[in-house]
């Protein structure tokens, strides 16, 4: 028999042997889980991960790791479960986005459920959250999938980690929900004179992230239902709330002169928080074609993932606008006619 004839036979034999090997490992894996040998089970999951990914059997690998992580979480083996979760994200990255959007989205709630199942004391959980968000940017923009942010926000909120929850709620593109969350935070943690600050910071951040619709939905929910605001419709008693009201309308009208006048008029109020003027400067670049200012390190108090997002926003002023410099100058000349 020629080599050409024996080649396919040899290849088929190797595949068959490999499948038998996987079957044996799966059988031992079930026994280890049933017998409480969780470290051994963890190692076998890793072995199967390497075999499946080497064979590009990504779907089999994903289902195996998801099931394994769930089982280990149920057995309170959270460190091992977190490791499988990280391998699952790694497999999703190796596989890449699929043509079927429904399959891509399937893993957003699944990963959210796994994150929810891990205790906050699990060391690897923060790494898992960051890796999962990074993976989801391939599905939805540079800040990650909004549904994933909502699921993560719920986890932090349930644990009482209000600041981390707030950051993720701001990125979930659900302004009504964000407004309700901010109301609860301000009523439980803020003083009467700070009721407007919670709203203003959130709305300016959302506008800086080019999420105008969510920003206005947040504004509407907060001003309509916050019990301690002195008025619930324009004109408001709080100067900064009026500032936001005017800002939305100037963005829609693209009135550069009006924006500059508004910023000057409310400058004393904006100085109540050092971050506000930096956000307003970014908004000027995004919506009114103003020159970017020098890069900032970001306002104090924005740590973690959202702080990184803010730093990328602010540091990207000059770099992002370099290619569009001539266009910006032309637009500014046109806008000068409005002054």
Swiss-Prot record:
GO annotation terms (biological process): protein insertion into ER membrane
One Pfam match: GET4
GO CC annotation: BAT3 complex; cytosol
Domain of life: Eukaryota
InterPro entries, alphabetized: GET4, TPR-like_helical_dom_sf
PANTHER family: GOLGI TO ER TRAFFIC PROTEIN 4 HOMOLOG
Protein family (similarity comment): Belongs to the GET4 family.
Known role: May play a role in insertion of tail-anchored proteins into the endoplasmic reticulum membrane.
Protein known as: Golgi to ER traffic protein 4 homolog
């Amino acid at each position: 028999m020629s080599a050409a004839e024996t080649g396919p036979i040899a290849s088929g034999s190797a595949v068959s042997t490999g499948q038998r090997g996987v079957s044996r490992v799966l059988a031992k894996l079930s026994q280890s889980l049933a017998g409480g040998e969780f470290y051994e089970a963890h190692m076998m999951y890793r072995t199967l991960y390497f075999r499946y990914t080497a064979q590009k059997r990504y779907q089999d690998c994903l289902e195996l790791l998801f099931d394994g992580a769930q089982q280990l979480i149920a057995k309170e083996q959270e460190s091992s479960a977190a490791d499988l979760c990280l391998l699952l994200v790694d497999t999703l990255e190796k596989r890449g986005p699929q043509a079927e959007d429904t399959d891509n989205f399937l893993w957003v709630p699944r990963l959210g459920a796994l994150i929810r199942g891990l205790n906050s004391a699990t060391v690897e959980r923060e790494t898992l959250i960051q890796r999962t968000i990074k993976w989801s940017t391939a599905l939805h923009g540079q800040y990650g999938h909004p549904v994933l942010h909502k699921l993560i926000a719920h986890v932090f909120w349930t644990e009482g980690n209000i600041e981390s929850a707030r950051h993720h709620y701001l990125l979930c593109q659900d302004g009504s929900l964000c407004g309700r969350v901010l109301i609860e935070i301000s009523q439980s943690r803020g003083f009467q004179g700070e009721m407007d600050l919670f709203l203003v910071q959130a709305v300016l951040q959302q506008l800086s992230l080019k999420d105008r619709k969510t920003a206005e939905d947040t504004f509407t929910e907060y001003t309509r239902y916050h019990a301690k605001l002195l008025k619930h419709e324009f004109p408001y008693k709080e100067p900064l709330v009026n500032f936001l009201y005017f800002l939305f309308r100037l963005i829609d009208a693209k009135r550069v002169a009006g924006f500059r006048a508004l910023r000057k008029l409310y400058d004393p109020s904006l100085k109540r928080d050092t971050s506000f003027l930096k956000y307003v400067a970014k908004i000027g670049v995004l919506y009114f074609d103003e020159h970017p200012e020098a890069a900032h390190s970001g306002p104090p108090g924005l740590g973690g993932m959202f702080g990184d997002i803010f730093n990328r926003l602010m540091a990207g002023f000059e770099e992002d606008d370099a290619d569009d410099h001539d266009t910006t100058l032309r637009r500014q000349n046109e806008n000068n006619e409005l002054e």
